[in-house]
């Protein structure tokens, strides 16, 4: 078992280190991490800083990166913080709330399943991304990263709190659907989300390059959305949801394709022809709606010539 601690239990002088995976999710479906891959980067940072980590934190609460740090915490017998540095998942390393608060990585360690470990000193979070990504590509397209070594006092106020318990709560809803008249409504209500459309995936184009999965899913409307065509565009995570050329939701808000039968999420690497989905969107943490948050992870950064508009405004309603 892993001990989960709250932000209130974190001491100012405790050292907090993230553990995360980097790379294209399609690669990690076949190239599984080893035990040493999860722990080597953290231990390399301990040697570099001459200090021991006291607490592990997830960089993001989305996908496999919500579980990698749990595995590392179990192996190293360290507690894990009920918080993360995104409040969702993002594809690039500078897209962390630490960066939004002026905390830049001093040293970064990247490791693979074979035991290779690289340590470098980036000048800022963007260079941390560039260099980590290059190493990840050379390590086969997926690797593990520890990119900060922070005192508890710096972590407080620069993370998204309570996200692991929130993830467990969402899991409980999905695992006990018999308790709800409408599980989709339960999920949307809990996360202040919006239904965008129901549809069937008619085509998926996907390319793995530069350490990412890039692609587009074309979707034909179902149920109340028959006769309409939609699309999802992704770089590991979904960036925009469209009806024709109209944007229905965009980063930094969260866009999720839910299996229309099971209500479980379908990640971008698992979307395929014939998938029947309910596409929904949830507002991001308020830290991402600041000017630096939008600059770091808004639609302009990903090459879209549109300004960020919160999903609740795009959908014309407040929750």
Language-model regions, residue ranges each:
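Catalytic or ion-translocation cores adjacent to nucleophile or general acid/base/metal-coordination motifs
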Residues: 3-8, 78-116
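Glycine-rich oxoanion-binding loops at beta->alpha junctions
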Residues: 10-54
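A structural-propensity feature for long, helix-poor, extended segments
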Residues: 14-21, 95-135
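Short glycine/serine/threonine-rich phosphate/pyrophosphate-binding segments
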Residues: 38-39, 59-70, 87-92
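A short, small-residue-rich loop immediately preceding and capping a beta-strand
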Residues: 52-65, 79-81
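Conserved anion/nucleotide-ligand pocket segment
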Residues: 113-163
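Oxyanion-binding "anion nests"
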Residues: 168-221
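C-terminal non-catalytic interaction/assembly regions of soluble proteins
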Residues: 204-319
């Amino acid at each position: 078992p892993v001990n989960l601690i709250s932000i209130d239990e974190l001491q100012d002088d405790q050292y907090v280190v993230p553990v995360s995976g980097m790379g294209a999710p399609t690669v990690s479906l076949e190239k599984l991490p080893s035990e040493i891959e999860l722990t080597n980067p953290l231990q390399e940072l301990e040697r570099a800083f001459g200090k021991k980590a006291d607490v592990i934190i997830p960089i993001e609460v989305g996908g496999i990166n919500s579980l990698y740090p749990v595995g590392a915490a179990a192996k190293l017998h360290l507690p894990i913080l009920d918080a993360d540095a995104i409040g969702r998942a993002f594809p690039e390393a500078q897209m962390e709330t630490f960066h939004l608060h002026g905390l830049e990585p001093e040293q970064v360690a990247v490791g693979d399943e074979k035991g290779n470990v690289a340590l470098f000193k980036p000048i800022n979070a963007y260079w941390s991304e560039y260099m980590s990504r290059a190493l990840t590509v050379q390590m086969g397209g997926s690797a593990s990263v520890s990119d900060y070594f922070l005192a508890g006092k710096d972590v407080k106020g620069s993370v998204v709190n309570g996200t692991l318990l929130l993830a467990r709560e969402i899991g409980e809803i999905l695992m006990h659907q018999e308790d709800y008249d409408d599980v989709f409504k339960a999920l949307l209500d809990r996360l202040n989300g919006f239904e965008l459309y129901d549809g069937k995936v008619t085509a998926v184009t996907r390319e793995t390059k530069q350490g990412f999965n890039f692609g587009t899913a074309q979707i034909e409307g179902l149920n109340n959305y028959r006769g309409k065509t939609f699309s999802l565009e992704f770089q590991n995570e979904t960036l925009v949801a469209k009806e024709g050329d109209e944007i229905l939701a965009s980063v930094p808000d969260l866009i999720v394709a839910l299996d229309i039968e099971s209500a479980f999420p379908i990640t971008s690497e698992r979307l395929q022809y014939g998938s029947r989905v309910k596409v929904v969107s949830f507002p991001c943490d308020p830290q991402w709606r600041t000017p630096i948050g939008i600059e770091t992870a808004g639609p302009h950064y990903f090459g879209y010539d549109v300004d960020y508009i919160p999903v609740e405004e795009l959908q014309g309603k407040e929750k």
